[in-house]
Every structure is written in structure tokens, then in C-alpha cells.
Curated annotation (Swiss-Prot):
Residues in HD-GYP domain copies: 148-345
Keyword set, alphabetical order: c-di-GMP, Hydrolase, Metal-binding, Phosphoprotein
GO terms assigned for molecular function: hydrolase activity; metal ion binding
Effect of E169A: Can form pGpG but not GMP
Protein name per the record: Cyclic di-GMP phosphodiesterase TM_0186
Length: 368
């Protein structure tokens, strides 16, 4: 370790230098500030006398610290003036030593200061290395979650496709229910996270229908009471399928699958929940699912006109549906109408100009 002694008094400088050399330090000496600054670039410790010819000790401290920030600087002074000591500390001095210098105390102070310097060097190096590792970990974690998110969306799409293979209309229905649920949740002031999650989870509401026999699922007519009891099981089947996952979206999907046929007045299934017993996700999807089912063609029914479906949902507010959800839904009436008409126009052009006609007497009671 190299110590720079900056002292204009030859006797004091040589005494300190000799003692420190015997203590195992490499010593460099300077009798003025200009030479001290010139020699300070690679030293570990600098002992600077306050009273120097030409450049003041305070100025020397400042310049040494600017040139070699890691250097430990001691101010050597015969004065008790605290103002001078304060100015030296403000200039960058780490400690001060009073004259006449106690050489053993000087050695101990230097040794202690160097130990602290080494500790801080290793600590800073470690922190820098740790910061780099944390950056890499964050980057790796970000990549992992991006891959996980992509994987999850693929799973959601596969689950939707499973429904599509059983009922070709189901896939488009689930997409519309997802969009409607997201818009209703947004209109209700739900969090951005919830809006995103319900938009992806709502399309899974009927996933349990993959466990319903085709003779019931695709029956072109009203179900018998026995058949309807079997159809009701799609809610619990869907819940069992989705609830096995720890994914927040699939957990929400399980909740929706189980509760989207519950009704505000307690007349729904499978558990006959009512009002606030029904989770908000189930209340939202109940409206989205019912509306889309009303205006869509099914093997057992023709579609209702949009205006008629809106008014039917409105008339059932506080009966079958949550008043709060219906209120948000009706605020979106123009936007929803535009989207559905645009989709209908696209379907009509693809089907050679054919469009669907509604039949009288097809109400919400026909929704499965």
C-alpha cells in the first residue's frame, strides 16, 4: 500500500515517512501542493498538512480527491480551529490527525482506513456484480413470463377449439362473449387486470359442453326436463376442468363456468345463488352470454333482432340479471349494435345474401 506524505517541514515529513516504511508501507513524499497533486494518481493514502506554501492544504485535498477518488485523505493540522477541519472535510478529507503526530496512532488510523477502503471496494464490486445478475434475472424472468403468457393463450385457444369441434357456432359465440364481458367490465370501472383476465376467461364459460352428449347439445328443439338436467352439468364439468390450473385466468374461467347460469333472483343453476352471492364475473358473463345467445341462431331457435334483445335484457334487470351490470351493458348499446351489424353484414356477404329471421316466442328461457 502506498502512502503520500505532503508536508513542507522536512523533519516531520521524514519522521512520518521513516516510521511508515518500517511498518511496511511504500512511502512517497512531497513538500508542496503542486508536487503532491502530481504524485497522487496511484496512491492509497495521502497525509496532507493544512499549512503548505503556495497551494493550500484544503485545495490540495480537493484536487487529490478529484484525481484519485478512492484515495483515503488525512488532514494533518496543529490547529484546533474546527472551521478549518470542516472545510477540509467538505473538500473531501476522510479524517484528520493533530500535530504533534503520534506515529503509532497514525499507523493504526491508516491501517483501519485501508481495511475500510478494501471492504468498500469489494462491496461496491459485489453490488455491481449483483446488480448485473439481477438485471439478467429480470430479463430471464421477463422472457419466461412472455413465453408463459404465449403458452397460456395457446391453451385458451385450444380449449376454445375443443368446444368448436362439438358445436361450430360455439367458437364465434365464445369470442363475442369474451369481447362483451371485457367491455362491460371496463364500463363498470373494473381494474385493467380484471378487464384483461375476464376477456380471456369468459370464452371458456361453456367449455363443460364437451362433456354433454351430441344428442342433447345439438338437438334441434326444446330439451325435455331430463335432457335439461344433463345440459346443466356443463357448468360443473367446466369448473372441474379449469379449476385444476393455478393460472389466474383459468381460475377465473372456472368461476365463470360454474356461475354464468346463476340468476339475480336465485332461479339459476347449478346452486341457485342469488344477488351478491354470485361473483361479479358470473354476473357479467350471464348478461354477455344471454344477449349473444338471443341474437344468434341455434339448432333449437332463430335469432332475435338486436333492439328486441336489448329491451329484453333491460326488462329482466333486477330479476335475472344484476342491475349494475345491465346498466353498464345498456350504456354500450350503440357500440355493441354497430359491432354486431358489421359482423352480420360480413356473414350475409359470405352466405350469398342470406340472413336469419327471428321467430316469435323465443325468449331468454330458451338459452342453454
Amino acid at each position: 500500500m502506498t502512502v503520500l506524505i505532503v508536508e513542507d517541514d522536512d523533519i516531520t515529513r521524514e519522521a512520518m515517512g521513516q516510521y511508515l516504511k518500517l511498518s511496511g508501507f511504500n512511502v512517497i513524499e512531497a513538500e508542496n501542493g503542486e508536487k503532491a497533486v502530481e504524485l497522487s494518481e496511484n496512491v492509497d493514502v495521502a497525509l496532507v498538512d493544512v499549512m503548505l506554501p503556495g497551494m493550500s492544504g484544503i485545495e490540495v485535498v480537493n484536487k487529490i480527491k478529484a484525481k484519485n477518488p478512492s484515495c483515503v485523505v488525512f488532514v494533518v493540522t496543529a490547529y484546533d480551529d474546527t472551521e478549518i477541519v470542516k472545510k477540509c472535510v467538505e473538500a473531501g478529507a476522510d479524517d484528520f490527525i493533530k500535530k504533534p503526530v503520534n506515529l503509532e496512532l497514525l499507523r493504526l488510523k491508516i491501517t483501519h482506513a485501508l481495511r475500510n477502503r478494501v471492504f468498500h471496494m469489494y462491496r461496491n464490486s459485489y453490488l455491481k456484480s449483483l446488480k448485473k445478475k439481477l438485471f439478467l434475472l429480470e430479463k430471464t424472468a421477463e422472457e419466461f413470463f412472455t413465453e408463459y403468457e404465449d403458452f397460456l393463450f395457446e391453451v385458451l385457444e385450444i380449449l376454445n377449439m375443443l368446444s368448436e369441434y362439438r358445436d361450430m357456432e360455439t367458437h364465434r359465440h365464445t369470442e363475442r362473449v369474451g369481447w362483451l364481458s371485457g367491455r362491460i367490465a371496463e364500463e363498470m370501472g373494473m381494474s385493467e387486470v380484471f378487464v384483461t383476465e375476464i376477456q380471456f376467461a369468459a370464452p371458456l364459460h361453456d367449455i363443460g359442453k364437451i362433456g354433454i352428449p351430441d344428442r342433447i347439445l345439438l338437438k334441434p328443439g326444446i330439451l325435455t326436463p331430463e335432457e335439461f338436467e344433463i345440459m346443466k352439468q356443463h357448468t360443473t364439468i367446466g369448473f372441474r376442468i379449469l379449476s385444476r390450473s393455478n393460472s389466474p385466468i383459468l381460475q377465473l374461467g372456472a368461476e365463470i363456468a360454474l356461475t354464468h347460469h346463476e340468476r339475480w333472483d336465485g332461479s339459476g343453476y347449478p346452486r341457485g345463488l342469488k344477488e351478491r352471492e354470485i361473483p361479479i364475473s358470473g354476473l357479467i358473463v350471464a348478461v354477455a352470454d344471454s344477449f349473444d345467445a338471443m341474437v344468434s341462431r341455434r339448432p333449437y331457435k332463430n335469432p332475435k333482432p338486436l333492439e328486441e334483445a336489448f329491451r329484453e335484457i333491460e326488462s329482466l334487470s333486477g330479476k335475472l340479471y344484476s342491475p349494475e351490470v345491465v346498466e353498464a351493458f345498456l350504456k354500450l348499446e350503440k357500440e355493441i349494435t354497430d359491432v354486431y351489424r358489421r359482423e352480420k353484414d360480413e356473414d350475409t356477404s359470405h352466405n350469398g345474401g342470406r340472413s336469419h329471421q327471428s321467430s316469435p316466442g323465443e325468449g331468454v328461457e330458451g338459452i342453454r
